[in-house]
Amino acid sequence: MKNLDKNIDGKSYANKLLKKIFPLSQEYFYKFNRKPSLAVILIGEDPASNVYVKNKIRTAEANNIKSIEIKLPTETLEEELLQKIVSLNEDVEIDGILVQLPLPNHISEQNVINTINPDKDVDGFHPVNFGKLYMGVPNFVPCTPLGCLYMLKNELKHLSGKNAVIVGRSNIVGKPMASLLLSSNCTVTLTHSKTKYLKEHCKKADILIAAVGCPEMIDDTYVNENAIVIDVGINRVADPLQNKKSMLVGDINYKKVYNIVKKITPVPGGVGPMTIACLMHNTIKAAYKNKKYNFIDILEDST
């Protein structure tokens, strides 16, 4: 049984954030006579993507956010998808647009992201939003790094001066996470597959964030006893205890690392719930911006 004293409970933090979001969505409804709205586009029948979309829609509906699910077949042409996005951009009743990734191989992910109106880009992947994040004037921040930062601020209270090491340099997690931590006055090391002496970098971390997509890659030889570990990885592997069944593991070897570090996010139940909660935050923010209404960001005060 997991000792909850060392676990960072992502579900609890997500619920804490959603409790702040729900009254904002109600206030929006009373002011503008409609719910904030989120359009979610799903292409194909990928089982994992279907689960993620269902979770997002369920959370939206539970928080008084209207969700519009648009399912398209795998063979949908890129031009057809781009035209659908353009129509959603022009629809004043749509506040946020999300295209579930990954996409079929014949569709350019970057072309799709570039087509979304930056003010409706609740995933925070558009180059305009990336640029604003790096300039220190963020518009929409990618949901997973935003959720990680929320948990870190609650766990540590003060991030200034902390050594933060990120394993993985993707546009979805690694790079925006580095920018957020730099803005919080951390000393940031962004590592990747070509980094030399990776263990030595990780061993020095006050904050270690794993987002490399390699099951249980980081073990007890990578960490120190004062580290706060955030495991972004979601990997499905064979369950050694149950024949023909699978299980979810992170990029951290939880069993080996748990007894050493100060705090750690489990998989599942760590980063995942916060990612969805931050998507709801971005959708509410987009809805208020759509109405040119002042939005006081509830994440500015994370405690």
List where the protein language model places each region:
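Positively charged, low-complexity intrinsically disordered leader regions
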Residues: 1-33
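C-terminal helix-to-coil terminal segments
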Residues: 2-8, 12, 273-303
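Short beta-strand segments enriched in small/hydrophobic residues
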Residues: 35-45
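Glycine-rich phosphate/diphosphate-binding loop of Rossmann-like nucleotide-binding domains
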Residues: 43-57, 139-228, 232, 245-255
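Short beta-strand elements in bilobed, periplasmic/extracellular small-molecule ligand-binding domains
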Residues: 60-74, 188-190
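Short, well-structured alpha-helical segments in soluble
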Residues: 80-92
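Anion-binding alpha/beta catalytic cores of soluble intermediary-metabolism enzymes, centered on
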Residues: 98-159
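Rossmann-fold NAD(P)-binding glycine/threonine-rich loop
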Residues: 109-126, 130, 233-290
